[in-house]
Swiss-Prot record:
<keyword id="KW-0496">Mitochondrion</keyword>
<comment type="subunit">
    <text>Component of the ER-mitochondria encounter structure (ERMES) or MDM complex, composed of mmm1, mdm10, mdm12 and mdm34. Associates with the mitochondrial outer membrane sorting assembly machinery SAM(core) complex.</text>
</comment>
<dbReference type="GO" id="GO:1990456">
    <property type="term" value="P:mitochondrion-endoplasmic reticulum membrane tethering"/>
</dbReference>
<feature type="region of interest" description="Disordered">
    <location>
        <begin position="429"/>
        <end position="455"/>
    </location>
</feature>
<dbReference type="GO" id="GO:0045040">
    <property type="term" value="P:protein insertion into mitochondrial outer membrane"/>
</dbReference>
<dbReference type="GO" id="GO:0051654">
    <property type="term" value="P:establishment of mitochondrion localization"/>
</dbReference>
<comment type="similarity">
    <text>Belongs to the MDM10 family.</text>
</comment>
<keyword id="KW-1134">Transmembrane beta strand</keyword>
<dbReference type="GO" id="GO:0032865">
    <property type="term" value="C:ERMES complex"/>
</dbReference>
<comment type="function">
    <text>Component of the ERMES/MDM complex, which serves as a molecular tether to connect the endoplasmic reticulum and mitochondria. Components of this complex are involved in the control of mitochondrial shape and protein biogenesis and may function in phospholipid exchange. mdm10 is involved in the late assembly steps of the general translocase of the mitochondrial outer membrane (TOM complex). Functions in the tom40-specific route of the assembly of outer membrane beta-barrel proteins, including the association of tom40 with the receptor tom22 and small TOM proteins.</text>
</comment>
<dbReference type="GO" id="GO:0070096">
    <property type="term" value="P:mitochondrial outer membrane translocase complex assembly"/>
</dbReference>
<dbReference type="GO" id="GO:0000002">
    <property type="term" value="P:mitochondrial genome maintenance"/>
</dbReference>
<keyword id="KW-1000">Mitochondrion outer membrane</keyword>
<feature type="compositionally biased region" description="Gly residues">
    <location>
        <begin position="444"/>
        <end position="455"/>
    </location>
</feature>
<dbReference type="InterPro" id="IPR027539">
    <property type="entry name" value="Mdm10"/>
</dbReference>
<keyword id="KW-0812">Transmembrane</keyword>
<keyword id="KW-0472">Membrane</keyword>
């Protein structure tokens, strides 16, 4: 489940119309949400608040074995007036990221001045009249500041500076500083990661630099198909999207080189929607069955290749129903002939709001219905049937993940009253011990442990609960 500060950063990106999915780093985001989720290992309590549309705070306390915590503050020049902050009102699908439906590329807004577009978001209702000087010059460009202090020692400070330079460019600076032990006289270790992103809708580029080993990096993504900056009139909606990308890193200090390339094919929302009468009439020449959607369910396929290490990874994710999604990943190394296979799924559970209690029947209800039917006009308007979607809400989600070594992860995330709760457990052979070490540590008698596995290898990776409340 996303932290409250990550949720506010996501709301900031949506408020400034920045597409976080149009990036090479998000190429396999759908499979990672279903397969690489983490489970809490201890008891943690989060208290957060969006005190004003511009300022948010968050406090975290962890216990069981080791007591630690963190304090986080966030400031945004863009008012987040329409962002629900109460834990009872935040949509659960915003926090528990599952199958991510890829959206068609969108061109940046360049018709009006970008300063007025970004600086005036949400300010038309909240800015009082006659107070034009209340908005500082920094607010002309959408800016976000976030700082998190982790306690106790060794104290770690994480800071983030995010600023929109133009409708197509965004600058991000992340700082991580670690203070040593109390008796240590060494200076705090710090590193800076800078990232400049350029997104046009058709393609995106990211330029990175890290002070850690003076690392330079580049990431790029190209979307095949029509250019959203030059839309055509009377064009049919795009049904699928094919994207290709690559990344490269180089460090002159450590002579480190890294690169990878990947492909992604995904269906778009128009592929699973029922076409309208006008669009179906125009598509009679291309398909004979225009009354049905092109695809019965959304799906995403990815292929990632790392040439230097010889690694090949493929993923296939699909959403079988609005409440059920599956994903699988197969990895293979051409040098070591090692393989990896992971499968996972998520199941959403909806809670239907209780219907009002029925009126006590005194035996004459049939007569009252007869009288109402007699008084009803012959051509009275028929009320549309009520759907259960508006009477239902997402209550919880269950995620399951298993690999070829029978390492199993179970994660339950849901809402209990006004609290957001995450509970997870990890089962299976310990991944920290190699087979040879496990064989050497096994007694000669080959005894079994209490959990049914080989002694010396833990079958419980961790059990934890995380409780969050925000206002």
């Amino acid at each position: 489940m996303l932290d409250f500060m990550d949720y506010i950063q996501l709301a900031f990106a949506e408020a400034t119309n920045w597409n976080r999915d149009n990036s090479y780093s998000s190429l396999t985001a759908t499979a990672q949400s279903l397969l690489d989720f983490s489970t809490p290992e201890r008891l943690r309590v989060h208290l957060s608040s969006l005190a004003t549309p511009h300022f948010a705070t968050s406090y975290t306390l962890g216990t069981v074995g080791l007591i630690d915590g963190s304090v986080s503050y966030l400031y945004s020049t863009v008012p987040l007036n329409n962002t629900p902050s109460r834990s009872a009102l935040i949509p659960l699908r915003k926090l528990a990221r599952g199958y991510r439906q890829v959206q068609p590329p969108v061109a940046p807004v360049e018709d009006c001045g970008w300063q007025s577009c970004l600086g005036g978001l949400g300010s038309s209702e909240s800015k009082p009249s006659g107070n034009d000087d209340s908005q500082p010059s920094l607010g002309r460009k959408a800016t976000l500041l976030n700082a998190t202090l982790h306690l106790p020692p060794p104290t770690i400070l994480n800071a983030l500076f995010l600023r929109r330079m133009s409708p197509t460019m965004q600058l991000s600076l992340a700082v991580c500083s670690t203070r040593g032990a109390p008796l240590s006289n060494s200076a705090p270790q710090a590193s800076l990661l800078g990232q400049l992103s350029h997104d046009t809708g058709k393609y995106s580029n990211e330029y990175l630099f890290s002070t850690d080993n003076s690392l330079f990096g580049w990431r790029g993504l190209w979307n095949f198909g029509p250019d959203p900056r030059h839309p055509k009139e009377n064009s049919s909606p795009q049904l699928s999207l094919l994207s290709a990308g690559a990344e490269a890193y180089y460090s002159p200090v450590s002579s480190l080189i890294g690169m990878s390339t990947g492909l992604r094919f995904s269906t778009l929302p128009a592929a699973t929607e029922m076409p309208s009468s006008s669009s179906s009439a125009s598509s009679t020449t291309t398909t004979s069955n225009h009354g049905t959607p092109i695809s019965t369910f959304p799906y995403t396929l990815t292929l990632v290749l790392t040439p230097l290490t010889g690694s090949l990874s493929t993923t296939y994710s699909l959403r079988a129903s609005p409440n059920l999604a599956f994903s699988s990943r197969f990895g293979f190394n051409v040098y070591s002939w090692e393989s990896e296979m992971v499968a996972g799924c998520e199941l959403w559970r909806k809670r239907r709001k209780p219907s009002p209690p029925p009126v006590d029947d005194d035996g004459l209800e049939w007569a009252r219905r007869k009288m109402r039917m007699a008084d009803t006009p012959a051509f009275a308007p028929v009320e549309p049937p009520t759907t259960h979607n508006r009477d239902e809400e997402n209550e919880s989600v269950l995620k399951i993940r298993v690999d070829q070594s029978w390492n199993v992860r179970l994660l339950w995330e849901g809402r209990v009253k006004e609290l957001l709760v995450s509970a997870g457990v990890g089962l299976g052979p310990s991944s920290f011990s190699s087979p040879s070490r496990a064989a050497n540590s096994t007694p000669a008698g080959g005894g079994q442990s209490v959990g049914g596995g080989i002694s010396g290898r833990s079958y419980w990776h961790g059990v934890g609960v995380s409780i969050s409340y925000s206002s």
